[in-house]
Swiss-Prot record:
Gene name, Swiss-Prot/TrEMBL: DTX56
Family of the protein in this entry: Belongs to the multi antimicrobial extrusion (MATE) (TC 2.A.66.1) family.
Signal peptide (residue range): none
Membrane topology of the entry: Multi-pass membrane protein
Tissue specificity comment: Preferentially expressed in guard cells.
Localization annotation: Cell membrane
Gene Ontology biological process terms from the UniProt entry: cellular response to carbon dioxide; regulation of stomatal opening; xenobiotic detoxification by transmembrane export across the plasma membrane
Protein name stated in the entry: Protein DETOXIFICATION 56
């Protein structure tokens, strides 16, 4: 046998080994890219949680009535304002991510400008809602004095709406390009000032000052991020010269609005479900104890949510970038790599929650043994929920990265509202399971959400989605034009 024939006989094995090596290298490369995007986001989200905790602490120092009214006002702001603005700004992720992958900086610029205008417009009716919060709360049976404090708190929180109308799009604009370090550093700088701002304003204006500190801190982030975008974009002349800031067509607006509806509902349906759970818990026997346990457990969940949300942003960015670059294999690899990471992270998060269940409750109370025991028990159930919660977040962001947020909306609607809440209420009230029943219902509902999204993702035609991304970013049209002109010249 000749040397040539020997080498040929080894070709299949060598080829298989090379393919395996190449696959591992590509996965490792993908993980490195996602770590670079995700780690700063984890820090940023944890800082945001710290900012909210600081606000709660300073509200508590204003007295029991101010704490109740301010907390109620902030919950109202979350449900009617923040969730809506965050949800609508999420529509930028697939457009900007795919535009960046396709190097269509004009589309990036115009989407940022349109998103800011859209959020400012949406902020107007939300503002009127906040100004009438006193009537709304008393109409639902809330105490007059608490409703009045909530109205005062929201009145001085109003500037947060236009500020978030700039902040949310700026964050989405940068993160969709994989630029997350500036977001982390600007958030860290502003958060470091949040405590001194609170000290000064809470002493001078009381609960009004605590509300003002929230939007002043976010306003600092807006100024810093705006400065960063302007300076860096001007340094990269190619990006700045493409312009597009004021060059919007009706089709551009239609695309953004079509995506913003499902994106907004996806976020709101999830946020509102947790708020409804808290309200329903207030109808259990010993409501003060039950609500306290649930809030303490959810506070630990918020810490894990910082990691969860960062994973989701990573995969949405990577999938949309690869589809925009017309690389369906890269998008597929990014999606499934992050899904595996999400499953592993969910298991780790569950173990961390179990490990801290004895310590976490003691941070809030030392004397109430019923609450301490309740926290230990409920954190075990919540740990099981985290196992499915992490991959659920990843799956939701995968479908968003493919510009199909309606899939996430249908999954959340089915899982949270057709199953989790009805089943939880049945177990809690009729089966006398109490708070445990609500969490079991939540687990079953989230599991359904995950199952639906996994089926959707398994059926994705990545080649087709890459083609759609080229149409979205107008590359297909440009290529057809250039091909047509080329054929004319040949003829």
């Amino acid at each position: 046998m000749s040397e040539t024939s020997k080498s040929e006989s080894l070709d299949p094995e060598v080829s298989e080994g090379l393919c395996s090596k190449t696959l591992m290298q590509s996965i490792v490369h993908e993980l490195k890219l996602q770590m670079r995007i995700g780690l700063p986001l984890v820090v940023m989200n944890l800082l945001w949680f710290g900012k909210m905790t600081t606000t709660s602490v300073f509200l508590g120092r204003q007295g029991e009535l101010n704490l109740a009214g301010g907390s109620l006002g902030f919950s109202f702001a979350n449900v009617t304002g923040f969730s809506v603005l965050y949800g609508i700004s999420a529509a930028m992720e697939p457009i900007c991510g795919q535009a960046f992958g396709a190097k269509n900086f004009k589309l990036l610029h115009k989407t940022l400008f349109m998103a800011v205008l859209l959020l400012l417009l949406i902020s107007v009716p939300i503002s009127f809602l906040w100004l009438n919060v006193h009537k709304i709360l008393t109409g639902f049976g809330q105490r007059e004095d608490i409703s009045f404090i909530a109205k005062k708190y929201l009145l001085y929180l109003l500037p947060e709406l236009p500020i978030l109308s700039f902040l949310c799009p700026l964050k989405a604009y940068l993160s969709s390009q994989g630029v997350t370090l500036p977001i982390m550093f600007t958030t860290a700088a502003a958060t470091s000032l949040h405590i001194p701002i609170n000290i000064v304003l809470s002493k001078a204006r009381g609960i009004e000052g605590v509300a003002m500190a929230v939007w002043i801190t976010d306003f600092i982030v807006v100024i810093l991020l705006t400065g960063y975008v302007i300076v860096v974009e001007r340094m990269k002349e190619n990006k700045w010269k493409q312009g597009g800031w004021l060059n919007q067509s009706a089709q551009d607006w239609l695309t953004l609005i079509k995506l913003s509806g499902p994106c907004c509902l996806t976020v709101c349906l999830e946020w509102w479900c947790y708020e409804i759970l808290v309200l329903l818990t207030g109808r259990l026997p010993n409501p003060v104890q039950a609500v306290s346990i649930l809030i303490i457990v959810f506070n630990f969940d918020y810490l894990l949510y910082a990691v969860m949300l960062s994973l989701g942003t990573c995969v949405a960015t990577r999938v949309s970038n690869e589809l925009g670059a017309n690389n369906p294999k890269g998008a597929y690899r990014a999606a499934y790599t992050t899904l595996i990471v999400g499953i592993i992270s969910g298991c780790i998060g569950a173990l961390v929650m179990i490990a801290f269940r004895g310590f976490w409750g003691s941070l809030y109370t030392h004397h109430d043994q019923l609450i301490l025991n309740g926290v230990k028990k409920m954190m075990l159930i919540m740990a099981v929920i985290e196992v499915v919660n992490f991959p659920l977040m990843v799956c939701g962001e995968i479908v968003r990265g493919t510009a199909k947020p309606s899939l996430g909306m249908y999954a959340n609607l089915s899982g949270f509202y057709l199953l989790a809440l009805p089943l939880g209420a049945t177990l809690a009230f009729k089966a006398k399971q109490g708070l445990q029943g609500f969490l079991i219902g939540l687990f079953v509902g989230i599991s359904l959400c995950l199952s639906i999204l996994l089926i959707f993702i398994a059926r994705i035609d990545w080649e087709k989605e890459a083609g759609k991304a080229q149409i979205l970013t107008c590359n297909t049209e440009d290529e057809q034009t250039s091909q047509g002109s080329g054929q004319d010249s040949h003829s």
